[in-house]
Swiss-Prot record:
Catalytic activity: 2 reduced [2Fe-2S]-[ferredoxin] + NADP(+) + H(+) = 2 oxidized [2Fe-2S]-[ferredoxin] + NADPH
Cofactor (UniProt): FAD
Top-level EC class as recorded in UniProt: oxidoreductase
Chain residues that bind FAD: E33, Q41, Y46, V86, L119, D277, S318
A molecular-function term among this protein's GO annotations: NADP binding
Protein name (Swiss-Prot/TrEMBL): Ferredoxin--NADP reductase
Organism: Lactococcus lactis subsp. cremoris (strain SK11)
Protein family (similarity comment): Belongs to the ferredoxin--NADP reductase type 2 family.
Top-level taxon: Bacteria
E.C. number(s) listed in UniProt: 1.18.1.2
Length: 321
């Protein structure tokens, strides 16, 4: 394969948009993704969940967002390699070698859009949890809301995922119980208000105590008080454990394993950029909408370095298409 201007590692939303923007700025680009399907977390973990904070889209599911991004990407020349895991990235004489389990591709610049890395759901921590998960009694994310139609569902968690899924499940489930170990939720204020004004039964501050057949028992925090009700399914939204793997030697990362970036989203290795949840800097906000902007910064910066007659600021898309 010929030497490219840019290789993007990771085909989540930020990676897909970055590839489109790179093509719009005239760069030759390839994307490498370890999963068999592009789209990252929205496509693979919550394809039916509604996302509300993408500019210009009042609400969009993870699956539809991925579909839209792929349609946008189809407007420019690119190559997308799925099912390839990047093992390491090396740089020699100003050229990067991106070595995967299947190939060795070369580029003048690399953009990491690997998200939070390898994700492993946090579990309830009970003895028979694996068996209950195999039986479909316990889930950690939802790929199809149909599995919960007409069911009594308990959602454990206090963040945005637990709140959002509770609202989504209310539309299809018979009953939804939201269980949080604290009295206050950590999600967006508007979402918390929607939950509190819905038909969702909120139980705070309670924790899991026991689950036998369909009988769920909760224990009140710092009190000798239990609560029992019938449940068909449990959804655990305690977040994910992340495993960030450093792909390049001497790449500077922060304490949380994310790659340190400057104001132009470049790492300490010249020509190696980062955007989205894989990046870290002062004031970092781990939001998809922010990641799109970070990708634009990175692409414009590398375009300026690769093509010295190009301005740092890209033109308007309306003048290109």
């Amino acid at each position: 394969m010929q030497e490219l201007d840019l290789i993007i590692v990771g085909a989540g939303p930020v990676g897909l948009y970055a590839a489109f923007y790179a093509g719009m700025r005239g760069l030759s680009v390839a994307i490498i993704e370890s999963a068999q399907v592009a789209g990252g977390q929205p496509q693979n973990l919550y394809p039916e969940k509604l996302i509300y904070d993408i500019a210009g889209l009042p609400a969009v599911t993870g699956a539809d967002l991925t579909k839209n991004l792929l349609e946008q990407l189809a407007q420019i020349s690119h190559r997308l390699f799925l099912g390839e895991s990047v093992q390491k990235i090396e740089k020699e004489d100003g050229i990067f070698s991106v070595i995967t389990d299947k190939s060795n591709r070369k580029a003048k610049a690399v953009l990491l859009t690997t998200g939070a890395g390898l994700l492993k759901p946090r579990k309830l921590g009970i003895d028979n949890e694996e068996n209950l998960a195999n039986e479909g009694k316990i889930s950690y994310f939802i790929t199809s809301l149909k599995e919960f139609e007409g069911k009594n569902v308990a959602v454990f968690g206090g963040g945005d995922s637990a709140l959002d899924w509770s609202l989504m499940l209310e539309k299809v489930a018979k009953e939804v119980h939201l269980v949080h170990r604290r009295t206050a939720f950590r999600g967006h204020e508007m979402t918390v208000d929607r939950v509190m004004n819905s038909g969702i039964q909120v139980h705070t501050p309670y924790t899991f105590s026991n689950f036998n057949e369909n009988d769920l028992e909760l224990k009140k925090v710092k009190a000798e008080e239990n609560l029992n009700f019938s449940i068909d399914k449990i959804l655990v939204n305690y977040g994910f454990l992340t495993n960030q793997v450093s792909l390049a030697e001497n790449l500077e990362v922060s304490r949380n394993g994310r790659v340190k970036a400057d104001s132009m989203m470049q790492s300490n290795i010249e020509g190696l950029y980062v955007a989205g949840d894989a990046s870290d800097y002062a004031g970092k906000m781990p939001l998809m909408s922010v990641g799109f902007g970070e990708a634009v910064h990175a692409i414009n910066a590398m375009t300026k370095k690769l093509e010295f007659d190009h301005p740092l600021r890209g033109g308007h898309s309306s003048s290109i298409f």
